[in-house]
Every structure is written in C-alpha cells, then in structure tokens.
C-alpha cells in the first residue's frame, strides 16, 4: 500500500500513552471499584435531573413523539436512505442542537435528555439515532465545546444547531484502532497561515451528507510546528474533497457512511482545534462523553425487544399454553426484562454523572458502552429465538402475508454494529484495563517497563513495596462481610455486599496478575478482558440497586416492581461474575494462542477443503490508495441548506 505508515509496537504504545488523560482530578466510582474500594456515596442517592429539567425534557419528548408518529421506519429500510423531509422535521424540532449551548442557537439539553431522545428516535429506525449521534457526540459540536476557541464556536456551532450536519473523519483504509499508522497529512502552507490536507478517510458516518467535517491528519514536524496528529474543522464542500463511495452494511440501512478523499484541501489555521499534536487527545476526550450515546441507542432497541417479547409470548400458544409460560422461553423473557432494567440504570446513572460534572466518568462511560453493546446484542438474539422463524423473517415479508410487521431481524442486524462502533469491544476492554491498572503501573514503575534492566527493576520493586504494603491489607476485610451493611437497601443489600467483596477480590486478582506477568501483563488480553468484564457487571449491579432504591423512595408501588427486576438481574449477573472469576485462572488462553498461531501459519488448511470461496480474486483485503485528485464522481449531497443566519431550508 503506497501510503502505509510503518510504526513499531513501542511507537504505537507511546502515542496511545501520550494521548490518554493521565490525571485524575475528580473522583471516579469505577476506578475505585477496580482498586478494591466501593465508594457507594458517589452514586447513592441515585442522581436525578432537577424538576425543571425533567419537565423541559418531557415537553420536548411529547413534541418529538408527535413528529415521529409521521415517520415510517420501513421507508428508510426499503430505500436505504433517510428521506429529506424526515431530516427537515428533526432540524425544525432542534434535534441537531440538543447539546449545543443556547447562546449558539442550541437547546442546551442535558446528557440525560439527549439520551432519551436517541432512545426514542432509534426505535423508529436506528439510522436516525446514528445520524443524530454521529453529528453531536463525535462530530463538530462536541470537540469544539471541549477544545474550540470562542471564535470557532461562534462560527460553527449555530450552523450545527440549525441542521448543518457534521461528521468525524479518523479511520483510514489501513488505520483502525491504531492511529499511529495514520497516513493522512496536513502540511503547513502560506507561511503557516493554512494547512493542505491530503488523504483518504474510511467509514465516515454522516460524511456523505455533511456540511462540516472534523478531520484528523498528521502535521509533519518542522521549525515552528510541533507536528503530530491534529484536528481540523473543514467545510465539506471545500475544493479537493470528494465522497467517492457510499458504503453499504449489514444493518443501519439508512446510514450516510462513505469514503472521502482529500486532495490539496486548503484549511485556514484558524480551523485547527486546539494545538498541533492534540488531535488524538481531543478525539479520546470527546469520546469519554460521546460514548454515552451508544448505550442509549442500544437500550432503546432493548426496550423495544422487551415489548415484542412480552406481547408475542402471550399471543403465541404452543402445547396448550402461551409460549411465555414454558420454562425454556420464560428464562429468556426474564433475562430480557432484567437486563433491560440494568441497561436503563447504567445509562441513566452514567448520563446524570456526566451532567453533574462532579466525577471523572471516563471509565464509567467506557464500561457503559462496552456492557450495553454486549448485553443488548444478547437481548436481540434471545428475542429472535423467541420469535422463531418469524424472528428471522423480514418485517416486509411478514406484512405481505398479513402478519404484524415486527422488524426483529432488522433489530438484530442494527444492534450488531454497537460492538464495533467507537471502539470495538476488544479494544474497549484494553482501554478500560489500562485505566483500571493505572495505579498499579504508577506504583510498579520500571517493573512494568519491558525495556528496564535488572537494576532498574530492583529499584522499582523497592518503591512498589511501599504502595502495596499499605494497599494489600485493606483488601482482606471490608463492609461486604458484615451482614447488616447497606440494610437501607432491604433485599438488595446482599447484592451490594457482594459487589463490595467482589471489588476487593477483583483488586487482589489484578495484583496477582501484575505480580505474575509484570511487563507482560499487557499481552494477557484474555485475563485483562475478564477483569474488565467483572468490573462492568459490578458497575451494572450497583447501578440497578441504587436506582431501584431511588424508585422505592419516590413511589413504593413502582419501587416494589423495580426491586423485583433488580433482584432478578443481580442474581443473573452474580452467576456471570463468579464464572468470570473462575476463568481468570482456569481457561484455555495459552492453548488458544498456540492453536491460533498454527492456524495462521497454515498448519490446518486441510480443514478448509471442500468449499468454494467466491470472494477470491475480487480484490485485496485492504484497498490501497495513492495521493492525488479523485477519479470518481462526487457522491456528496445535502439534506438541508443552512444559511449564515442559521435558518434551515430544504
């Protein structure tokens, strides 16, 4: 590949470390959980919006529901495109400015309100949620709110609020989760007054219809330029920008996701967000809050799955009674309902913590994204199984033969991307693990440095002993061993005691892993993934219990029902946690790695005999690209034309 950038593992790691937020200026519930502490006071009482904010949100949702009643999701699915009038309606409601401050023409709504909007629009069609989320969570508004200048906010935020759609351009044909390989460049020109962008960006959600782009590109280091991956706001109709492809996917049939070529695109220096070299840090910081949109979207679909499962399992009769009364199906319904309660709790808690700003939520947001994506996919799969052949059949086909057009197979297809979007589950586990072991890495020093010599490791060991001499004894005994602890939670107190005990057990096991593998721990991705999954389940149990207690306090009748749901969820989650603890040290990780290496070396190719692979000869695994002008037609189009006065017009 002509533009492939070669980097070593060490260079890639260094860039990742340089780009992450290293300080912890605010408390973090999840960080403490991984360290063996259970600071319940950080999440209890369950935070909630003010009465005024709640009333404002409800009023907006009423208007949104009225509009969505006129939107037909099947039209989007069949056409694989969102009709212009649907986008116009969302813009007129202010949906593109939900999180933009009112001084820039936005609605200045909370993260909680924003997520409730995403839940609702997603249940009409997931592409609507993707459109709004990509625009506001990772598009131009969020990076500018975090790192933009006053002038940048004045120039661009009113347009975004009015419906000028934005997109985020980071991924490249050969660059996914490893941005150190980024090949797109931003070369200073005009005596430093501008930059010239060159490159190709892949999977540009909203990129086909965007007015504004956030583009990540590498600035060469030179005199007067610190260089590095940098972020720019770019007008999508700038000369040299070509949308060469509109991609098609398994799900999200209406998503406007493409391939964008940039050739000699001139960008004024005033459009640089932050400093040169800050682009990746800005992107990661943006994602800390931006990731909360995906749990909301996943939860919206899971709620829809619960409704379908309930109604169908009463209606469908087999062997003399409704299928929902058969234990095999009842267990699935229980899982769907209990998991829905926890999904709701995790989304609400994380979002309200983001709104309050009292806590560092980088781990909570990442856990919410990881756990919600995984669990919602399981919910969708169980629903499909409950529906049987009708679950596998399309809504259009069901309707054609006179049955209710239930889009279960579409829901499953649409949910699947959440385990890949904005950090795959595998990458999320590694990112969270890095934060979870941060205190250990700080204490260990050169013990965790693969390049350190024996003298350096010996010195580091002496320093680490002080930290662990104070920390380890605190993991022996805790409040979770006292039978009366958390008794204000009634029947749920036992689950909070389980979380407290498990938190200390998790911390001890993390330490054992550090002691056993030291600098090699980062390569033990199976172990680290299980550590993170345990933390995610403990976070979800905590959120469910605290939310149930808040509901009981506010409304005893609803609270009793919430307790029932939370009880079922906690018991299910406890079984998963115990299995994960067992798997930390009893697993097939080593044999899996050995077998995978043998597979990659071609040892078992005889297993592949007797098949036809019709993809052979259709193209390379990864498309190459060369810098230069595009030879393709520009597929860019606009939903809306937003004037300088920020009025949205077709």
UniProtKB/Swiss-Prot annotation:
Its EC number is 1.3.-.-. GO terms for molecular function: acyl-CoA dehydrogenase activity; flavin adenine dinucleotide binding. GO terms for cellular component: cytoplasm; cytosol; peptidoglycan-based cell wall; plasma membrane. The keyword Oxidoreductase applies. Keywords: FAD, Flavoprotein, Oxidoreductase. Residues 1-23 are annotated as: Disordered. The active site is at 422 (proton acceptor). Belongs to the acyl-CoA dehydrogenase family. This is Probable acyl-CoA dehydrogenase FadE10. It comes from Mycobacterium tuberculosis (strain ATCC 25618 / H37Rv). The gene is fadE10.
């Amino acid at each position: 590949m002509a533009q492939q950038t070669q980097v070593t593992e060490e260079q890639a790691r260094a860039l990742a470390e340089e780009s992450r937020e290293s300080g912890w200026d605010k408390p973090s519930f999840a960080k403490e959980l991984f360290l063996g502490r259970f600071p319940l006071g950080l999440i209890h009482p369950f935070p909630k919006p003010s009465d005024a904010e709640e009333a404002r949100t409800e009023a907006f949702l009423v208007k949104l529901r009225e509009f969505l009643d006129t939107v037909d999701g099947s039209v989007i699915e069949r056409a694989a495109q969102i009709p212009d009038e649907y986008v116009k309606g969302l813009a007129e409601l202010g949906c593109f400015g939900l999180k933009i401050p009112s001084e820039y023409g936005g609605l200045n709504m909370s993260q909680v309100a924003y997520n409730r909007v995403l839940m609702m629009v997603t249940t009409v069609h997931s592409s609507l949620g993707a459109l709004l989320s990509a625009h506001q969570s990772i598009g131009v508004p969020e990076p500018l709110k975090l790192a933009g200048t006053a002038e940048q906010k004045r120039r661009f935020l009113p347009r975004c609020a009015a419906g000028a759609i934005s997109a985020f351009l980071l991924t490249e044909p050969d660059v996914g989760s490893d941005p150190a390989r980024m090949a797109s460049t931003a070369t200073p020109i005009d005596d430093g007054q501008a930059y010239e962008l060159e490159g190709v960006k892949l999977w540009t959600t909203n990129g086909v219809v965007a007015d504004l782009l956030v583009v990540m590109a590498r600035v060469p280091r030179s005199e007067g330029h610190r260089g590095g991956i940098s972020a720019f706001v770019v007008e999508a109709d700038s000369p040299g920008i070509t949308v060469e492809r509109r991609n098609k996917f398994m799900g999200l049939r209406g998503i406007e996701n493409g391939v964008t070529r940039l050739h000699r695109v001139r960008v004024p220096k005033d459009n640089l967000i932050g400093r040169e070299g800050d682009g990746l840090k800005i992107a990661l910081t943006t994602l800390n809050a931006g990731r909360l949109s995906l749990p909301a979207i996943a939860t919206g679909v899971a709620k829809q799955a619960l409704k379908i499962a309930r109604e169908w399992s009463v209606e469908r009769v087999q062997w003399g009674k409704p299928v929902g009364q058969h234990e095999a199906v009842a267990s699935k319904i229980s899982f769907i309902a209990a998991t829905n309660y926890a999904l709701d709790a995790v989304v609400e808690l994380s979002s309200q913590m983001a709104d309050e700003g009292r806590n560092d939520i980088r781990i909570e947001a990442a856990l919410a994204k990881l756990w919600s994506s995984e669990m919602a996919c399981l919910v969708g799969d169980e629903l499909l199984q409950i529906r049987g052949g009708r679950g596998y059949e399309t809504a259009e086909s069901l309707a054609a033969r006179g049955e209710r057009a239930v889009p279960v197979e579409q829901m499953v297809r649409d949910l699947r991307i959440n385990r890949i979007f904005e950090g795959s589950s595998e990458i999320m586990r590694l990112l969270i693990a890095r934060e979870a072991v941060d205190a250990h890495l700080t204490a260990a020093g050169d013990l965790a440095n693969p390049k350190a010599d024996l003298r350096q490791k010996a010195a580091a060991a002496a320093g680490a002993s002080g930290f662990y001499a104070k920390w380890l004894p605190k993991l022996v005994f805790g409040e979770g061993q006292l039978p009366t602890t958390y008794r204000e939670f009634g029947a749920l107190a036992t689950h909070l005691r389980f979380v407290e005990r498990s938190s200390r057990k998790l911390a001890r096991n993390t330490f054992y892993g550090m002691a056993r593998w030291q600098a090699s721990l980062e390569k033990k991705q199976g172990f680290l993934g299980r550590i993170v999954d345990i933390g995610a389940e403990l976070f979800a149990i905590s959120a469910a219990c605290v939310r149930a207690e808040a509901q009981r306090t506010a409304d005893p009748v609803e609270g009793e029902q919430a307790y029932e749901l939370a009880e079922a969820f906690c018991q299910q989650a406890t079984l998963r946690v115990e299995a994960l603890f067992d798997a930390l040290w009893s697993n097939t990780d080593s044999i899996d790695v050995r077998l995978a290496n043998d597979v990659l070396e071609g040892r078992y190719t005889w297993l592949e005999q007797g098949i036809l692979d019709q993809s052979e000869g259709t193209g390379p695994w990864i498309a190459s690209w060369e810098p230069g002008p595009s030879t393709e037609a520009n597929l860019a189009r606009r939903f809306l034309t937003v004037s300088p006065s920020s009025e949205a017009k077709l």
